[in-house]
Every structure is written in structure tokens, then in C-alpha cells.
Amino acid sequence: MANVTGYTKAGVDKLVAPLFSSISPFTVGGHYYSPVTYFWPDFYNEGQAGKVSKWAKTLAYGNALGYVIMNRSTGDWSAKDNDFLTQAQRAAAAGAKRILWYIPTRYGVASLAKDDAARNGVPDPDKFTREYIMQLCANLRSQYDGLFQGVFLDEVINGWGAQAGRVGWYGDLIGEIRRTYGKNFTIAINPGSNITEAVCALDFDVCMSFENTAAKYLTDDPNSPIANDVMRALPSTKWWHVIHGVTRENFRQVIDRAASFGVSHLYVTDGELVEGEGGQWVPEKNPYQNPPSDWIMERVLAWNGGYLGLAERVAALEAKAAPSPQPGA
């Protein structure tokens, strides 16, 4: 058939593609399962007898997935790794809405004087300069091209106390990333706690503003609220809560608590953190070493789909209708 409109398909695609790429996959008020996927690519274990693929178990969440994180040796992006390329491709195909790539920032201590107390105990305090972080971003774009959809900046300041002096350094870093990669590139930050108004004003897309235990999540602390008034005024898609040490008994309380904060991105796991002598840098038990137990998946999918209450009622009815065990059975 002749082209009567004067437009070719290639021409239309070129015009329309930028419009679709600028549409966020996240809806304010929506629920997204955004796991902390620090484990190594293991797609080659999928379907192998006697082997388990942690990534396959994670990607089984399908369209419920929000963000996933690629983390090679705590941010070593000096060379292309085809295992990470393949795993990122599989994550995108499974339904992950954005692929983030891990880069630590060491709380910006590289910007401080050599004798500043904030540098004490921080590994490689001089390494993660703004220039070095930008070079890692450039490496990632060169190595993984369109799969480099965003960056997960770990070990970010919350802006309180003496950290206030480093907000400008983060503003410069985030601003340079934004100018280089554009408005559709995702910038995630992880202070792991509530943040000041000055940090809220930075040009990030999502902030992991809670990363701690279920016990702490379910406790009100007026001296350290999980979300302050400035944070609560921002869209739900800005916030990502990670809760470990979750149990069958407190799962629903955790979910209800997240709803009270207006959080779109959630990761709950029954994995536990035990810092031990290694502290936060080398913990004895890491809650992200493995995906959550299977019982969490069914509940998370119900939460994501908006039918958690119904699923719980059905489960309660099934339990009530189940025959009681007979003596001697």
C-alpha cells in the first residue's frame, strides 16, 4: 500500500519514541516491589538440578517489580561484565521497570579535609570523588548502553548535623549526573533514614529513606521520625522503604505502616542483619544475601495488586475450614 500520509513508520517511531520514554513507569499512589538485589548474576543456575538462582526467584515477581539493582563488587565498573549484561536484560524482560547500577559515595567524605573526624572508619575515604563517580557512570553507559537506566547512589548523607556541610557536594554531583544523562534517567539515593529539607530539595527521583528492622519500623520515635513533614509533602514515588527481619506475625503491620507513610517502593524480607565485629561494612549476617522466603512472595503480590485484605480473608477461611487433625493420625 502506498504511503498516502507522507510519513514513514521509521519517521513516526522517531517522533513518538521520545514521548513514550519521558513517561514515568511509576504512578503516584502505586505499589512497587523494589528489592535490594546485591547478589551476583546467576542466570546460569536457573533450571539446573541441585542449584538455585536467586535472580530467577526475584524476577518471578514479574510486573510487580519496580527497581532492581545491579551491584558488581560494590561498584566496580572498571570493565564490562557480560554476566551483568545478561542479568540486566533478563530483569528488564521479566518486568523490572528500571535497572539501577550501584555506586557508593562514602558519605561524600572525599570532599573533606584529611583530618576530618567524619572520615574515620570509612573505607577508601579518598576514592569516591565526584570525578571518579562520574567516570564510573561514563563506564556504565559505554558498557551497558540502554540498560544503564539509572544509578543507585549508596552511602548518602541525610543532611543532619555536621553532614549539612556536604549537601552542596551532593547537589553538584546529582546536578552533573542529571545534566549528563537527562531527565528520564533515574537518580536514586540511599541515606537509609529521614532527610533534611535541604536534601529533599536535591534533584533525585527516589530516596531509600528507611533501611532497618521491622521492630524499628513499627516503633514511633519522636526524636527520629521515619518521615518528617517535608518528606510527607512529596509524592509517594519519591520514597523507598527497606525492612528486614519481617515475620509472618508482623508482615501486615509493616504493610499498614508503609501505607501510613505513603510509600510506593517497598522491599520486605525475613533476612536479618547482624553487624558483629565487622560493623556495617562487613556484617556477620547480611539481610540481602538471599531473596526473602517463599511465604513473603504471595503476600507481596497481593499487596502490589491491591487485594491483600481479600487474600488474608480467604486464607483465614481456608484455615478455619481445614479439618482438625484426628488423634493418632
Predicted regions and their residues:
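Amphipathic alpha-helical oligomerization/assembly segments
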Residues: 6, 11, 15-22, 307-325
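Glycan-processing catalytic domains of CAZymes
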Residues: 17-310
